[in-house]
Design a protein with these regions (language model features):
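Flexible "arm" and connector segments at domain edges
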Residues: 1-174
Length: 174
């Protein structure tokens, strides 16, 4: 998945839905941390997407999404990537001009929550430039999803389609 294309698309949807006002980078990064917490909650509650039921569903796509995908580990991991991409789009980050992130993690050697904490910690290191933290987060969530055998681009595309049809700020204050 091309991070630059994702960041432009995610940011466009977010702007169209009223998510961008003059707030600090920390405000938006905290919303990513919230999504990481929601991923842990989905894991704790054993909520996994039912792709087969979703794809065979006869109800409107939004209803099928809410029934079989929403609030699952896959959905929440997609939210992490989408928020990071959105912030990258707002900041005009060009991933093609960045050196690759050298971070490596043996995901299988750590628990789900430890991996979530490592992602949170990496995103919150304010001694590192915001661009590098976002790049780290994007690479981390994609590698983590791959380790979990989650087709993250598939779930990102589903969530972006779902988000495009939601109300202003998805009915939330921010």
């Amino acid at each position: 998945m091309n991070y630059n294309e994702l960041s432009k698309a995610a940011h466009k949807i977010a702007v169209n839905h009223g998510f961008w006002s003059k707030k600090s980078n920390e405000h938006y990064m905290m919303l990513v941390v919230v999504e990481i917490g929601e991923t842990v909650e989905a894991h704790r509650n054993r909520r996994y997407a039912d792709i087969k039921a979703f794809e065979q569903g006869t109800l409107p796509c939004v209803v099928n999404f809410e029934r079989f995908i929403k609030d699952t580990i896959e959905d929440e991991m997609a939210d992490i990537a989408i928020w990071l991409a959105d912030i990258a789009g707002a900041l005009g980050i060009n991933f093609d001009k960045m050196n690759p992130c050298r971070y490596h993690r043996a995901f299988d050697k750590f628990s789900f929550t430890e991996n979530a904490f490592a992602l949170t910690k990496g995103l919150c290191r304010d001694t590192i430039a915001i661009e590098k933290r976002i790049q780290f987060g994007m690479e981390y969530v994609f590698k983590w999803a791959k380790e979990l055998k989650i087709d993250l681009p598939y779930f990102i595309n589903l969530k972006m389609k779902y988000n495009a049809n939601r109300p202003l700020k998805n009915g939330k204050a921010y």
